[in-house]
Swiss-Prot record:
Classification lineage: Eukaryota, Viridiplantae, Streptophyta, Embryophyta, Tracheophyta
Gene: rps7
Subcellular location: Plastid, Chloroplast
UniProt record similarity statement: Belongs to the universal ribosomal protein uS7 family.
Subunit record text: Part of the 30S ribosomal subunit.
Function description: One of the primary rRNA binding proteins, it binds directly to 16S rRNA where it nucleates assembly of the head domain of the 30S subunit.
Organism, as annotated: Pisum sativum
Name of the featured protein: Small ribosomal subunit protein uS7c
Keyword field: Chloroplast, Plastid, Ribonucleoprotein, Ribosomal protein, RNA-binding, rRNA-binding
Keyword Chloroplast belongs to the record: yes
Highest taxon of source: Eukaryota
Amino acid sequence: MSRRGTAEKKKIAKSDPIYRNRVVNMLVNRIMKHGKKSLAYLIIYRAMKRIQQKTKTNPLSVLREAIRRVTPNLAVKARRVSGSTHQVPIEIESTQGKELAIRWLLAASRKRPGRNMAFKLSSELVDAAKGSGDAIRKKEETHRMAEANRTFAHFR
């Protein structure tokens, strides 16, 4: 809600140099720590190469499928009503859902046991594309929470 004129539109994410894909760039920006973008690119590209070797398919399609399967439609938001806090289910926009999916995929891959981040990320992406893994479980848990609190939907 801008107080002076119209609000600026959100910037559109740029695409990465090799795959020319915005989702890959979003993933790189999320995986980056302490401004080390070149290291983040290295991790992503190694993970993509490993997916290519493991599945013999285009790694971008595996990434898209994994994100599509992990993207939530609903989430719960805490809303305080007359002294008590209710978990109110809300619908999520596609961009916000994509961001959440990327965040969950990275969190799940960081939790995994394994040698390095590229190895763990590639394993998590392949599992998510198949419909299993920690990130999928997180999405299902979020949907269950939203379904359980459907009675509070009118507090939106």
